Design a protein with these regions (language model features):
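One-carbon transfer enzymes
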Residues: 1-266
């Protein structure tokens, strides 16, 4: 199959692509587009720090020198992952514009897979692949729709965190038919970002299974959500204050060090 992956230029997307692309490339032709960020760059100091560790640290400080090394680490940078693609990964921040639609059509995908992509697809984009658009959402649907929902689950004291694999059926956010929900125990010693990253091994396995089902010309079983759930935007200062009072952290550099070091050759 021809599969187009839509992702965001951040750490979690890269971790997910490292899990997916080597396996998908064995059987499928892959192309990929990325958004630079989700929403606008935050001005709150706490969220700005999170943005630095998720995005700026990789894109401006960590990955450029690694890309110039002759060897590769256990995880690949975005440029390194391009080896699994039919063409280098392309920026696409305007997928609903005429040029954006043309870019998606040029890949001629049978299936589109969205992972943390920072833009909303309109119906013209959704209708391009004849098999449809899959999305791997880092939260339990329909309860936790929107962005940074691991934050909301931690704030609520949830003992388990979830990812949801679902179809994007229309332009509404995180409302499509649900294929599977994968849970992992909350790490009480982890931070928001480390707990979010822990969702992707099981989430990507579910995604690979669904793609294998489609490749076999079958349809994954999918169920329409039984309620609209709750939609969350970025946390405001009150939510952040409550998060910190509960003893949580957005980022713990010590917890991220093993992940970041995995990009360096050993």
């Amino acid at each position: 199959m021809r599969i187009t992956l839509l992702n965001n230029r951040d750490l979690a997307s890269n971790v997910a692509l490292n899990l997916l692309l080597p396996q998908l490339a064995e059987r499928h032709q892959l192309s990929a587009f990325y958004s630079d960020q989700v929403g606008t760059q935050p001005d709150d100091p706490s969220l700005a720090m999170l943005f630095f560790f998720e995005h700026t640290l990789l894109d401006q400080l960590l990955f450029p020198p690694i890309d110039n090394l002759p060897q590769r680490g256990n995880r690949l940078t975005f440029r390194g992952l391009s080896a699994f693609l039919t063409a280098p990964m392309q920026r696409l921040n305007d997928p609903t514009s005429p040029s954006g639609i043309a870019s998606l059509k040029s890949a001629n995908p049978d299936l589109i897979v969205s992972i943390r992509y920072g833009r909303i697809l309109n119906q013209s984009a959704i209708d391009i692949p004849h098999l449809g658009v899959l999305n791997l959402h880092s939260g339990k649907l329909p309860q936790y729709r929107g962005v940074m929902v691991t934050f909301r689950a931690l704030l609520a004291g949830d003992a388990e965190l979830f990812s949801t694999l679902h179809w994007i059926d229309d332009e509404t956010i995180d409302t499509g038919r649900i294929i599977s929900i994968q849970g992992v125990p909350t790490d009480p010693n982890g931070c928001y970002l480390s707990n979010t990253l822990r969702l992707y091994p099981s989430g990507c396995r579910a995604l690979l299974e669904a793609i294998n089902t489609l490749h076999a010309q079958e349809s994954p079983v999918a169920v329409t959500p039984d309620s609209p759930g709750h939609y969350f935007t970025f946390p405001d200062r009150d939510a952040l204050a409550r998060f910190y009072r509960a003893g949580h952290r957005l980022v713990d550099p010590a917890l991220l060090a093993p992940i970041l070091s995995s990009y360096y050759p050993h």
